[in-house]
Each structure stands twice: as structure tokens, then as C-alpha cells.
Curated annotation (Swiss-Prot):
Start-end of Acidic residues biased regions: 470-479
UniProt keywords, alphabetically: ATP-binding, Helicase, Hydrolase, Nucleotide-binding, Nucleus, Ribosome biogenesis, RNA-binding, rRNA processing
Remaining remarks: Present with 1460 molecules/cell in log phase SD medium.
Protein name per its UniProtKB record: ATP-dependent RNA helicase dbp7
Main location group: nucleus
Length: 778
């Protein structure tokens, strides 16, 4: 096309085409943030020029005549700290103290130092509970012994020898209600039985007394039938009774009670076989002969399979203590094997008076009447024995209405506290400080937590050396001699309890020294046994922090207080926890920690355990606990900050805190299904919860130390990878694997899809095992 000589001239304003600045570097989040700031400046240039717009700007309009204009170039104020000066945040620069800061501060390494008392959720029913200020009358104990007197035991059918032994040696003047009902029934008929009663009402003696009485009667029958009259039932006569319990600690306690009973019948021999002990020693005891055997299901099933010296042909009584717990812990397979082998090996006895068939007794405080799970334990025509006469008439109706109902001893004073996640640890410390403030007010207390890692962390927190103790570690010579004298006065702890017993510096004071114990299922068996024995025998103020391993059946003397720092995984387990106190008619107290929000609905479950509808259930406020324990919020904040600095200064304890935090979250997800709407893991504020473990890291930055494979695990994975890929095996040169590890890193061709899948599966199994090990109860 020919040039027509036309000239086009478009004139554009200069502000139409603006230079586009391309943002480079940084992460995509940072680039996006810069873009948003630039867009906001472009849309509102006046606000950005003034800094805060109408707040500090110089726009036209009425102004306060008393206002003094301050230059924006003035530096922020600084607060003097122990190490010098520290720049304050924006909120503190305007006059807010360190204890009243509204927002979190940045610490070292990107950690967050937040205030204890900011942004805490308020309880839903914060004002509803302060209604009943009238003092309540003390309730009549429901698990106390009946009328005193020697005739009460003899009237139940026990021999005068056994009744006199109970009165003189064991100092038991009268039976409890459940003992009266069970002894009468079990001595009268040879049938299977359910024994259900409150915690602390003497269920162990309820089945041991009829058992010992029956075997003592066999001794008399054999003496009468023997011409010489000089022989009786002895250890070679055979095994007559087996008692199964879910935990090793409960087996030990049953064995101690049984040995105390058998002192009046020395010819009857009892023994134990439990996990964690040497099989060789147990087999030696079985070869010598036993009449009564106390065992855990797993170890008994092992001996029935592999020990020929264990003769069960004469077993006529099988007791399942805490039978529902046996099923819950996964012992169903072992119980089926035990029952089938007992049935197959049963033979008619040549001893006169031995029953023709075996009787099975199942006892627990939270026994449910639906026997679908327990039907496989061969219970036939079982008799239900209950202590409360009010329940006998309406037994079916009560169970139909609420099959999960549980009962709390009437004399137990139970309370709950709605505590924000940030304040959990400092509130627990304040409560325990107040509890042991006066000597003699409380002798023993138990703190229940959810997992073993949490036990280890809190044990170190409560037994750590305080700042004033660290300063006094290097005094002059005179104070050194005094310190040595005080050490000489202290009782030495057994070697088997080192690491599980220490002075509780967080609770102790100058007039009342408190000893701290820890117990969980991951400890070696001899350590668990010696720690529990030391706590039971200690007559000074002491605290046991433990998992549910100590919640079932253990009769620990003089326990005045039970604190559920982490709520139980079910209402039944809650009953067993608080049942460690208020035993045999004695008074006791219990406190449950709950979080604001959906956990407040747990109060209705607590009220169901009371006969009066929960009128005796009281509430404790966080402010009151902190005021009584620390004197106020300022001291509480100081204690928390000191604890966080202690964790940062000690990498070992910081890792322990992280383990406890992660394990606590995993344990929180294991509540029973019908209570999961109350303990909803999605409602947890993970950042606030981390502060209760003395952590300043963000939840996403808290790594799980136990899930990373170690050097030996990595070495095994490499060997398995080479084997599955068909590579040649090479010998390892040392501990680190040396050349093998380095060569494998540079050979991607040896890794196949099958090998990668196997590695992922192994890592997943390690993760599951790491989470499950801390809930080990048996």
C-alpha cells in the first residue's frame, strides 16, 4: 500500500504509563506482602504519608488544643533488663508493663514471648456457679466398714481362726458392705459371680477371704479323711486358684494382701508371675509348688504354653480383678487361651472337698451389665453382687437407663477448675504450693497426666533447682559444713529409685519439705516396684506424678488429694483415678483441670457420679488459685518466665518439653468416642498449650525428636534397601557405617519404587510405635 503521507500523533498524559517495579527475592509470602503494601499506598497515599491517618496526621479539621505534637523520629523507649537494655514493643512503649502487654514479643531465634494473661478465652458459665455459699454437711461415708465386733466376720461364715487373724493382726474390725455381700454369697454357692462396688470399698478382700476360707476347709477335710491325721494341704497338693490382674502393680498389691492373710495358714503357699520378671526364677517357684497364683494374662499364657511344671488340673477358682480393664487393654486373646487350656486340662481331684467345676469371679468398680465382651470368658449363670441395697430392687431399671453410670464415694469432696491453656502449669504449681503450705494439712497427693513424656517433663520442672538454690551451691566453709550435716540426716534413697525420687522444690518451703515421685509404664519393672513401695511407705509429705498405671486397684495409704491435670480418657477411668483417695470411709479431695470451651460440658458427666445430682461438686477459679499460691499475677508471670528461660538454657530439658507437648496432643486424641465431642482436638489452641510446656516456639516449629531415625536405624534401612534391590552385601566398617553410607547416597539407581514404599511403611510404623509406647500400662 502506498504511503499517503498521513502522520498520526497520539498525545497521552504522563500519569497514564507508570513504571512497573518487579519485586524479586524472598519467599512468595514476603513478595505478596510487599505487593499488598504497595497497593494500599497507591489507593490511600494520604494515610501512608501521615503514618496512621487521622491518628497522627496533619489533615485539616478540628484538633485537640491540648495535644502536643511529637516528632516521628523519636526512638522507642527501652526497658532495662538483667542483661542490659531491651527494646520495648509498641504496646509497652505507651506505658504498658511487661506483665500487662497485649501482644506477644519476639524472643531469641524467632520464639514468641507472650503474656500469661492476654487473649485467654473466658469460661462460658463464668458467673453461674457462685450461688451456693452455704456450708454443706459432711456426707456419710458409703464405703466405710460396718458395725465393729468380732462376731461380724464369724457370722459371715469365716472360721474363728481367720476372723481372729483379721482383727488382731490386720486390724480389720468389721467388713464393708461389699465384703459382707460377697463373702455370704461365695461361701454359700459355687457359682460364677460379678462383684461391683465403689472404689476403696475392699473388693480385694471380698474375693480373697472366701478363697482362703475354702482352701483352709480343704485342709481340714483332708486331715479328717487321712488315717494318720498329720498331713494337710501343702504346696505340693496342686494349684487351686488363679487371680488375674491387668497391671503388674496391682498384682504386687494383691500378693501383699494375700501373704498377710496366709500368715494364719502357713501351709498354703501363694506366688506371682508377672511381666518384667525373670522367667527362670518364676519357673523355679512353679516347680516347688503353689496353691494360689497371682498373674498378669500375658505371662500366665506364656507359662501355660511353655512351662510343663505348671499343673492346672486342680484349678477350681479363677478371679478376674478389674475384668473390664483386662478386656479394654487387649487381653481378650490371652484370656481365651487361658480359659480354653484350663478347661482342657481340668481333671477330677483326689482331695476331698474340692468342687467338681471351676467358678469364675469377675470384679470391678465400673462393671457394665452388658456381658457381650465378657461372654467369651465362660461365665455361666453369674450372680450379680452389689453392695448398695437401694440398687437391688431397681437393678434392671437403673442399668437400662444408664449403662455407663458410675458412683463416687459420698465423702469424697470433688471440685473442678476451668483453666486457660496458657495458665495450666502455673495454676497447677500454685495449687500444689497452697496445698503443702502448712505442715500436716496434706500428707500425700497424686497427680495424673496423660502420657509418660509428660510425666518426665513435669517431674523435672517440679524438682529443678531454683535460682536461690543455685546461688547457694558455693557458700563459705561454715555453711558447707551445715549443708553436709543436713545431707547426713536425710535418708538415702534406694539405688533402684534413683531418677524417680527427688525433693519437690516447687512445692516445698522452709517448714514443710515435700518429696516427688514419678511412675509410668515405660520404666523398668524393678524401678516401678521400688518407687511405688517407697511412696507407700513414706510418712512425710510426698507427691506422685504418674499415668493411669497407678489408677487401678492400688491401695496407697494416706492419699488425701488426687489431681487430674489431664482429664481421664473415659468416665470409668476417672472413677478409678479419684478412687485412690477417700478409701474405707476416710475423707478425700479431688480436683479436675478443664479447658474453657467444649470441655466445660464434662461437668455434667462429673455430676452423674453423685447420688445427689452433683450438689457436692464445687468449682475453683483460676484467679483464686493463683492468688493463694503465688500472691497474684505478677509472681505467677515471674515464675513462668523463669521456667521458660530455664528450658531455653538447657537443651536437654527443652527437648523433653517438646516431647511432652507432642505426646500430650497425641494422647488428647485418644478419648473414648462418646466423649470426643467434649475433648475435641480441633478446639485446642496449640500455641497457648505450648506455653504450658514452657515452650516459646510456634507450634509449627516444634519438631518431634523421637520420630527422626537415628544412625543405627538409618544403617539398617540402607542394608534392607540394598538387599531388596538385589545389590551386593558389604560388611560395615564401624559404628557409623562409614563407606557403606556414603556409597549408598550416590547411587540413586539402586532405589526402586518397592524400596521407597517399604521405607515409607517402616517410617510410618516407627511413628505409630513411638506414639503408642508412652501409653504402656502393663
Amino acid at each position: 500500500m502506498a504511503d499517503d503521507g498521513m502522520l498520526l500523533n497520539f498525545a497521552l498524559p504522563s500519569d497514564v504509563i507508570k513504571p512497573q517495579t518487579k519485586i524479586k527475592g524472598g519467599s512468595w509470602r514476603e513478595r505478596l506482602s510487599v505487593k499488598k503494601i504497595a497497593a494500599r499506598r497507591a489507593t490511600n497515599p494520604k494515610r501512608t504519608a501521615d503514618g496512621d491517618g487521622n491518628k497522627d496526621g496533619n489533615e485539616s479539621g478540628p484538633r485537640n488544643p491540648n495535644r502536643i505534637q511529637v516528632s516521628g523520629s523519636r526512638p522507642a523507649k527501652r526497658q532495662k533488663t538483667d542483661g542490659g537494655f531491651q527494646k520495648l514493643g509498641e504496646g509497652q512503649a505507651h506505658g504498658q508493663g511487661s506483665g500487662q502487654s497485649k501482644g506477644p514479643k519476639k524472643g531469641q531465634g524467632g520464639s514468641v514471648v507472650s503474656s500469661l494473661f492476654s487473649k485467654n478465652p473466658r469460661p462460658r458459665n463464668a458467673v453461674e456457679e457462685d450461688k451456693n455459699d452455704e456450708p454443706m454437711e459432711d456426707a456419710k461415708p458409703t464405703n466405710a466398714p460396718l458395725i465393729d465386733g468380732l462376731d461380724t466376720f464369724t457370722n459371715l461364715g469365716l472360721s474363728p481362726t481367720l476372723a481372729a487373724h483379721l482383727l488382731t493382726k490386720l486390724e480389720l474390725k468389721a467388713p464393708t458392705a461389699i465384703q459382707k455381700a460377697s463373702i455370704t454369697q461365695l461361701l454359700k454357692e459355687e457359682t460364677d459371680a460379678f462383684i461391683q462396688a465403689e472404689t476403696g470399698s475392699g473388693k480385694t478382700l471380698a474375693y480373697l477371704l472366701p478363697l482362703v476360707q475354702r482352701i483352709m476347709a480343704l485342709s481340714r477335710a483332708k486331715n479328717e479323711g487321712d488315717a494318720k491325721g498329720d498331713t494337710s494341704v501343702h504346696r505340693d497338693s496342686g494349684l487351686f486358684a488363679i487371680i488375674l490382674a491387668p497391671t503388674r502393680e496391682l498384682c504386687k498389691q494383691i500378693s501383699v494382701v494375700l501373704e498377710g492373710l496366709l500368715r494364719c495358714a502357713h501351709w498354703i503357699v501363694a506366688g506371682t508371675v508377672i511381666g518384667g520378671e525373670k522367667k527362670k526364677s518364676e519357673k523355679a517357684r512353679l516347680r516347688k509348688g503353689l496353691n494360689i497364683l497371682v498373674a498378669t494374662p500375658g505371662r500366665l499364657a506364656d507359662h501355660l504354653e511353655n512351662t510343663q511344671a505348671l499343673d492346672v488340673s486342680n484349678v477350681r477358682w479363677l478371679v478376674l480383678d478389674e475384668g473390664d480393664r483386662l478386656m479394654e487393654l487387649g487381653f481378650e486373646k490371652e484370656l481365651q487361651e487361658i480359659i480354653s487350656k484350663l478347661d482342657a486340662r481340668q481333671r477330677p481331684s483326689r482331695i476331698p472337698g474340692v468342687p467338681a467345676k471351676r467358678a469364675t469371679i469377675l470384679c470391678s468398680a465400673t462393671l457394665k451389665m452388658n456381658v457381650q465382651k465378657l461372654g467369651e470368658i465362660s461365665l455361666k449363670d453369674a450372680v450379680h453382687i452389689k453392695a448398695d441395697p437401694a440398687d437391688e430392687d431397681g437393678e434392671k431399671t437403673a442399668e437400662d437407663k444408664d449403662g455407663d453410670a458410675f458412683r463416687v464415694p459420698a465423702q469424697l469432696k470433688q471440685s473442678y477448675a476451668i483453666v486457660a491453656a496458657k495458665l495450666r502449669l502455673v495454676t497447677l504449681t500454685a495449687f500444689m504450693k497452697r496445698t503443702f503450705m502448712r505442715k500436716g494439712s496434706v500428707m500425700k497427693a497424686i497427680i495424673f497426666v496423660s502420657c509418660a513424656d509428660s510425666v518426665n517433663f513435669h517431674f523435672e520442672v517440679f524438682t529443678r533447682k531454683l535460682a536461690e538454690q543455685l546461688e547457694g551451691d558455693n557458700p563459705d566453709e561454715g555453711s558447707d559444713s551445715e549443708h553436709e550435716k543436713e545431707k547426713e540426716k536425710e535418708k538415702p534413697t534406694p539405688a533402684s529409685t534413683h531418677g524417680t525420687v527427688a525433693p519437690a522444690t516447687a512445692f516445698s518451703n522452709s517448714s514443710n519439705a515435700v518429696t516427688m515421685y514419678k511412675l509410668h509404664g515405660s520404666l523398668p519393672q524393678h524401678v516401678r516396684t521400688s518407687t511405688l513401695s517407697s511412696f507407700a511407705k513414706n510418712r512425710d509429705p510426698s507427691v506422685l506424678i504418674c499415668t493411669d498405671v497407678a489408677s487401678r486397684g492400688l491401695d496407697l495409704p494416706n492419699v488425701d488429694l488426687v489431681v487430674e491435670y489431664d482429664p481421664a480418657f473415659s468416665a470409668d477411668e476417672h472413677l478409678h483415678r479419684i478412687g485412690r483417695t477417700a478409701r474405707l470411709g476416710r475423707d478425700g479431695r479431688a480436683l479436675v483441670f478443664l479447658l474453657p470451651g467444649c470441655e466445660e460440658n464434662y461437668v455434667e458427666i462429673l455430676k452423674r457420679g453423685y447420688r445427689d445430682g452433683g450438689k457436692a461438686l464445687t468449682r475453683s477459679t483460676t484467679d483464686d488459685i493463683l492468688k493463694r499460691g503465688f500472691g497474684g499475677n505478677i509472681e505467677s508471670q515471674k515464675w513462668q518466665l523463669e521456667l521458660e528461660r530455664w528450658a531455653l538454657d538447657n537443651p536437654e530439658y527443652l527437648e523433653m518439653a517438646r516431647r511432652a507437648y507432642q505426646s500430650h496432643i497425641r494422647a488428647y486424641a485418644t478419648h473414648v468416642a462418646n466423649e470426643r465431642h467434649i475433648f475435641n482436638i480441633k478446639e485446642l489452641h496449640l500455641g497457648h498449650l505450648a506455653k504450658s510446656f514452657a515452650l516459646r516456639d510456634r507450634p509449627g516449629k516444634i519438631n518431634v525428636p523421637g520420630l527422626r531415625p537415628g544412625k543405627e536405624d538409618t544403617k539398617k534401612d540402607f542394608k534392607a534397601e540394598r538387599k531388596s534391590a538385589g545389590g551386593k552385601k558389604r560388611k560395615a566398617t564401624g559404628y557409623g557405617g562409614g563407606r557403606d553410607d556414603d556409597d549408598d547416597d550416590d547411587r540413586p539407581s539402586a532405589t526402586t519404587d518397592t524400596t521407597l514404599a517399604a521405607q515409607k511403611m517402616r517410617a510410618k510404623m516407627k511413628e505409630q510405635l513411638a506414639g503408642a509406647s508412652e501409653f504402656n500400662l502393663a
